[in-house]
């Protein structure tokens, strides 16, 4: 194992990062009235289209139907993505991030808990954004809204009153994400573990795709769902480490994850953080939405036909 990972794993074992980044439904319920605690619903829907691609839409209607008491809806595709980009879910500027989360009543010193009523990847994407801008205390509700409901906890409907706040002046940590040119350069240099977080089917080149089927040549397949239990809670730290070990992630100098548009790929990044690993890890933000459109950037298709 590369020493850069071993040092972080050793430190993580001493501080228990799972307690820092995950919260159970029962623990959240006991703290809902705590000063400085803000709960965000990141629900988004992603659906295959007839042309073989994908369409996405905010889950605001889901939020209006049911949400954790006091939670605010946070629009990943709208307020928390770069409106000037031709790609969905592109990282916003520091100013846009501060305005958007400030409008939800969040300040830089608040404790933020994020959940989704659909796939956890929407919550991990929002968690990653907060960490990208240096927010210190941000957690995921383990198991999402389904776990909250399974615990028999209270649900609200309708809109939640917003009280805007001044977030502050965050600094975007640009070493936490890369573009396609950086992938090409780092693959050529060596020492990179590139992880595809889409389904095995999509990795092979079957089913819906982002312009060209298949995966970036040289990347490993670790589907986002493989990091989770059946109830959508995160697997144990030992299981997560073994899962990443299986593709040789810790034998390389750097880990970069990608998917279709920078959403599912935040699940392995969050899983690494649960092990105490955040240094040397980056997200390919635009992922295959960018890569597949570049005809001379190498892709591999394992499916026949």
Predicted regions and their residues:
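Cytosolic catalytic domains that perform sulfur/thiol-centered chemistry
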Residues: 1-305
């Amino acid at each position: 194992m590369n020493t850069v990972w071993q040092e972080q794993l050793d430190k993580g074992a001493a501080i228990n990062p799972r307690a820092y980044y995950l919260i159970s439904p029962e623990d959240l319920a006991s703290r809902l009235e705590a000063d400085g605690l803000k709960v965000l619903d990141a629900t988004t829907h992603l659906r295959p289209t007839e042309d073989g691609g994908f369409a996405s839409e905010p889950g605001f209607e889901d939020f209006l139907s049911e949400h954790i008491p006091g939670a605010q809806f946070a629009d990943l595709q709208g307020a928390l993505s770069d409106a000037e980009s031709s790609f969905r879910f592109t990282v916003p500027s520091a100013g846009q991030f501060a305005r958007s989360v400030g409008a939800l009543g969040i300040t830089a010193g608040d404790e933020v808990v994020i959940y989704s009523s659909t796939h956890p990847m929407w919550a991990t994407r929002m968690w990653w954004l907060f960490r990208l801008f240096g927010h210190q205390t941000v957690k995921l509700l383990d198991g999402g809204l389904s776990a909250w409901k399974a615990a028999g906890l209270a649900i609200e409907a309708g809109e939640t009153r917003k009280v805007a706040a001044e977030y502050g002046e965050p600094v975007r940590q640009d070493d936490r994400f890369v573009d396609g040119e950086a992938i090409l350069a780092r693959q050529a240099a060596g020492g990179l573990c590139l992880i595809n977080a889409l389904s095995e089917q999509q990795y092979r080149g079957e089913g819906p795709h982002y312009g060209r089927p298949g995966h970036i040549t040289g990347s490993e397949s670790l589907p986002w769902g493989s990091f989770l239990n059946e109830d959508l809670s995160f697997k144990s730290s030992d299981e997560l480490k073994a899962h990443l070990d299986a593709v040789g992630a810790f034998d390389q100098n750097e880990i970069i994850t990608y998917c279709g548009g920078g959403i599912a790929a935040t699940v392995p990044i969050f899983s690494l953080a649960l092990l105490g690993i955040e240094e040397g890890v980056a997200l390919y933000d635009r992922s295959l939405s960018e890569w597949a459109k570049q005809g001379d950037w190498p892709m591999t298709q394992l499916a026949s036909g």
